[in-house]
Amino acid sequence: MQTQSSTESIFPEQAGYFSVPGAHLYTVLHQVTDPVARVLLVGPFASERHLSYNPWVRWARYLAARRIEVLRYDYRGVGESTGVFEEMSFGHWSEDIQLLAGWMAGRSPRVPFILHGLEVGAILAGRTFDEGSGDALLLWSPPANANQALGSTLRQWAAGGRQLYESSENRRSASGYIRELQEGAFVQVQGYLWSGRLWRDSFHFNMPTTLNEENKVSSDSKRPVKIVKLGKDASPLVKPFRGYLEVTDFSELYSRNFEWIASVLSSPIRKFNEEND
């Protein structure tokens, strides 16, 4: 992994590019000395990236300040990663997280590895965890399927800022855009060109049914799982998004979720302990 150091905080943040088939993922490693755990942050879908960016980065720094090494990244075709977004699929993004998870979990020294996802990122993290990656899983507001997240984004975008730039005769409702996607057309949403194929596939990109009951899966697999439903007060991490200039205090959210991670690290049921005794 090629990296370039940043000095924006007291903890080293290494920005670089991670090679995947046909593209390079932009990554930032929040590196710590003598980590007690590592976390891979799987962020929300493309069109929400810029809105949730600030609290997502602050969360990574919060964890790093508590000796948890964090890797965050942009999806293939999104943000500063390379790749053509309209050519991407959930399969590509699933492949990316598998490769990143393997790299992160294999870093030295070996410590517990936690997958953490937000909205569509929660589905990606959940599916990767279900396939055997990770010693614990933390999910924020996972939808039942990706279409729930895409649909709510499209509706808010169609009802909000999108219409400010259109003449009255060119304004369309969310249902109009959905109809175009269903017919196979491309629709630009928050700067990203959604394809009809992506829209169709989103209905079938689901959370694993094995993760429906977090307590049961934690007990059965001996790998802790926590699912958190974020409220409207968690904007701009989740929809509906408020104004760009509003600053939300996430200290309580960060604290509660860190406490869960800390409890996981002291728990004897960790798969990591069983494999490394």
List the predicted regions and their residue ranges.
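Glycine-rich nucleophile elbow surrounding the catalytic serine of serine-hydrolase chemistry
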Residues: H116-F129
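N-terminal cap/lid segment of alpha/beta-hydrolase-fold proteins
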Residues: M1-A37, F250
